[in-house]
Amino acid sequence: MKYRTSPALPVLTLILAVLVAPRAWASVYELPADGSPVVGTDSSVKSAYEDTLTDIAHRYSLGYYEIIRANPHVDVWLPGAGKDVMLPGRRILPPGPREGIVVNLPEHRLYYYPKPHGREKPVVITYPVSIGKMDWRTPLGATEVIAKIRNPSWYPPESVRKEHAENGDPLPKVVGPGPDNPLGDFAMRLAAGHGEYLIHGTNNPTAVGMSVTHGCVRMYPEDVAALFAIVPVGTRVRLVNEPVKVAWVGGELLLEAHPPVDEEGQTVEPDLQVLSAKLDHALGDSSAAIHWDLARATLQAANGIPTVVGIAADKPDAAAPTPQTSAANPSR
C-alpha cells in the first residue's frame, strides 16, 4: 500500500489521500495482528533506457545505498534498458515501541506509526532518509517534534559556513525559501541538542538515502510533504542504531543486516558478537536449526534484505537451510 496525508485525520482517510497523490510510493503497511515485526514484500521492475538506479530509487521511495546494495551487479548510472532491478520492500521493524517516529541510522530509513482512531488497524509508514556524514553525526536517543515550518529559511551555523568557505563555496548567513534552499519546502524541528536538528526536504533528491547531511534527517520532497501533513507537534521521535535486526516468521528466523555506524556516524566493520547476541536472544529457550555460515555471510553482505538463516525444530522442513542444529555456535 502507498499514500499521503493531513494532521488530525483518521488513518484510513490519510491512506486514501496518499493513494491519489502524484507520487504515491511511500510504503504504508498494516501492522501484523500477531505482533510480528516483519512487513512488506520485495519486488522488481525492468529499467528503461533513460533510467539510472537513483531515478528508480526516487520513483519507488528507496534510498541510494538501499537500491545499490540490493543490486550490486547493476550499473548505478547506466543500467541499460530491460535490466531487472530489485526493489527491496520487505523489512524487519526496528525494536522498541511502535509509536511516533523512529529513525534507524544504519538503515537510512524513517518509520512513522500514526495513532489509529476507533477501530482502525494500526499501520506503519516508512521513507528513506539521509543522515549525518562523518564528523556531523545525527544524534541518537529520544526526542520530539517541537515545531513545523513551511518554506523554512536556512541559517547555516558558523561551522558549516567555515567548511563551505574552505571548499571554495561560501555561504550567506541566511538562505531564504526557494530552489536554492537545501532544506526544501518543509521542516520539522527536533528538541535534540539546542533545536538545531531538523527533519526536512531537499533540493538534491539524488543524495537521499546516504550519509551526507550536517546531522539533520533529509527526505525526498514528496515524502517530507506527506509526513509534514500528518505529524503533529509533540510527536515522539527515537533515533536508533540497529544495524542487525532479527525476527521469527512462520517458523523461520530472518536476519536483516546493514553496515553498522559508530558514535561518530562512520561505517565500521560488522560485529560478530552483536550477531551472536541477537540470534541467541531471538532463539530464547526454543530449539532451532541455525545456518551460522549463512548468518555470517548475511552480516558481511549487509544488503538490508531479510534472509532466512534458521528454521524452528518443530517446522516440517526444519532441515531447509542446511544448518548446524543447536542454539549454540562453537565457532563464534
Task: Pin down the residues of each PLM region.
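Bacterial N-terminal signal peptides that target proteins for export
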Residues: 2-12
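Cleavable N-terminal signal peptides
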Residues: 13-14, 24
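Primarily a LysM-type cell-wall glycan-binding module
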Residues: 28-61
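LysM (lysin motif) carbohydrate-binding repeats in extracellular/periplasmic proteins that recognize
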Residues: 48-78, 122-123
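Loop/turn positions that initiate beta-strands
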Residues: 50, 80-85, 234-237
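Gly/Pro-biased beta-strand-loop elements
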Residues: 91-203, 226-229, 257-331
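C-terminal soluble interaction/assembly domains
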Residues: 213, 224-232, 239-251, 258-270
